[in-house]
Amino acid sequence: MSNKKVLMLMSGGVDSSVAAYLLKEQNYHVIGLHFKTVSDVVFSLIPEKKKVCCSPSDTQDALKIADKLDLDDFQIVDIKKEFKEKIIDYFIKTYKEGKTPNPCMLCNRFFKFGKALEIAHSYGADWVSSGHYLIKEYSNKYSTYIIKKGVDQYKDQSYFLSYIDKNTLPKLHFPLGNMYKVEIRDIANKIGLSVANKPDSQELCFIPDNDYRRFLKENGVTTEEGKVYDLEGNEIGTHTGYMNYTIGQRSGISYYKNANVKLHVYKIFPQKNVLIVAPTEEMYSKELIVQNVNFFVDFKEIEGFCRVRKKSEEKPAVVKKIADHTLKVSFKEPIFAVTPGQFATIYDESGVVLASGVINIKEMGEV
């Protein structure tokens, strides 16, 4: 890194705190940046079910860490208006379309590694750093900067950053990519950080209680009860509104036929407020289409690995480019419950992220 001034994304958690400490130890001038994405009132009215980011307590923790580490500067930036337009509105729109969104992907692209770079430029800092677990490096194989999996397979966050703009990579730095979580907590304890044993964030910052149905209803999204059909077109039950369901889900359906069969949501038709359900063996797919693809490495056809949701493993697949920003993924073995709206990320055999995009139901075959 040739420029010694770095903008550090400070969430108030242990990872970004230790990352900031490590940069200070390497004599970088570190400027802390903390985003406010939602009003503090949200957290006073809605209790956190699990730990979320961007809460008022996180802001206070980030301030304390910035002071303890004697950062060169620390800024709290209010992005509530932009965040609503780019992230919350997208979240609501995607559910209205009968799909399942992943707002963290877009937050990383537009804010953590988008707007943060603009702020870094205003400080004369050419670098943005964070406490994410992944590796950025120049690849001789691909003749470009790439991101790849961090060494800690349990904390690797390459999937969540697979939709950031490739052009930002030369300006990003991830100090924790070659470290393990246990090392981070050990360092935090040794230097006396108050957040050393703070739990990791698990839920969306704008839905502290993780109750999507409540959130959608409070934002004017209401649906009526609808009908449930099996694959043969028989009406076999009712549901509470199509936006309350995702592909693969089993709960929340009232059956008056086939109640003894294990059935999953197979397809969602938002315009008709109808769900199609199917037994487990019908929920597997060998192909999917990925649209709005973000390429880190351009290719026509490769044998690689595809991950289709945050809590899943990559599966071997042949991936073919069928249009400028569209991929066809053919899996070696069928995978369960491919979910429109989620992101599919393509890796090579060494864990390098090649591309990422949105699974789109309109172009998919049987799912």
Curated annotation (Swiss-Prot):
UniProt cross-references to Gene3D superfamilies, sorted A to Z: Adenine nucleotide alpha hydrolases-like domains, HUPs, Translation factors
Main location: cytoplasm
Keywords: ATP-binding, Cytoplasm, Disulfide bond, Nucleotide-binding, RNA-binding, Transferase, tRNA processing, tRNA-binding
Active site annotation, chain numbering: C107, C205
GO biological process, one term: tRNA wobble position uridine thiolation
Region (Interaction with tRNA), start-end ranges: 155-157
UniProt entry tagged with the keyword Cell membrane: no
HAMAP family tied to this protein: tRNA_thiouridyl_MnmA
Protein's recorded name: tRNA-specific 2-thiouridylase MnmA
Lineage, opening ranks: Bacteria, Thermotogati, Thermotogota, Thermotogae, Petrotogales
